[in-house]
Amino acid sequence: MPGSALLSLQQELRRGFEALKAAKDTFDGGHAECQELVSSLGNLAPQLKALKQVQISETPLSGFPCLQQRLHYKLSLAVDALLAKLAEKMAALQKVWDAFAQQVFTVVQLYEKNTDALDISVCVSRSAVCPSVSDMLEWLQDADRYYRLQLMQSRLLLQTLTPTDLTSMETAPNRWRSVRSARQEERIADALCQVSIFLETE
């Protein structure tokens, strides 16, 4: 039943791209929110450095007991609070990616299960309103790999951020920006544009 297999695959492809749209929106917003938090961490680093270098005992503030330790404790709490918020954001992004990755897996599994019933010429044919099945499968898998890599790199970056490593904290905002690939983001946006009419048809 080649026709039935193709219709089922197209239905799963639609679900896959709907999941991709949701993932893209969430990752775009989540990355921007995390960028603000990471920038705040970067701003705390110079304060911690300055506190480490200053001798409060030699300033007019010397009359306040344990001031240096209390200021350090307060700044460290601020770092911990920002890291906790970042961990929450990453957990939310992980859930979104998990849902998208599961849908991509379902699509690929369905395609592989019905390979014998799907004519290769049908899978590679495209029209002005509908990309080919092979193109759409490739786009979904590329997006899946990209978001997985983005999550992994983001987690690795966050693991380097502690109040004891001020250099990593100070350079974190620029490193966070580099986690995203403008080229990959453009490819995902282009893929969603190309499937827009396909998604509206049943």
From Swiss-Prot:
UniProt-listed Pfam families: CA109-like
High-level lineage: Eukaryota, Metazoa, Chordata, Craniata, Vertebrata
Protein name: AFG2-interacting ribosome maturation factor
Keywords for this protein: Cytoplasm, Developmental protein, Nucleus, Ribosome biogenesis
Organism this protein belongs to: Danio rerio (Zebrafish)
Localization terms from the record: Nucleus; Cytoplasm
InterPro entries: CA109-like
Keyword Nucleus recorded: yes
A GO biological-process term: ribosomal large subunit biogenesis
Any one of the GO CC terms: nucleus
Disruption phenotype: Embryos show defects in branchial arch and ceratohyal development.
Keyword Cytoplasm annotated: yes
Subunit relationships: Part of the 55LCC heterohexameric ATPase complex. Does not associate with pre-60S ribosomal particles.
Described function: Part of the 55LCC heterohexameric ATPase complex which is chromatin-associated and promotes replisome proteostasis to maintain replication fork progression and genome stability. Required for replication fork progression, sister chromatid cohesion, and chromosome stability. The ATPase activity is specifically enhanced by replication fork DNA and is coupled to cysteine protease-dependent cleavage of replisome substrates in response to replication fork damage.
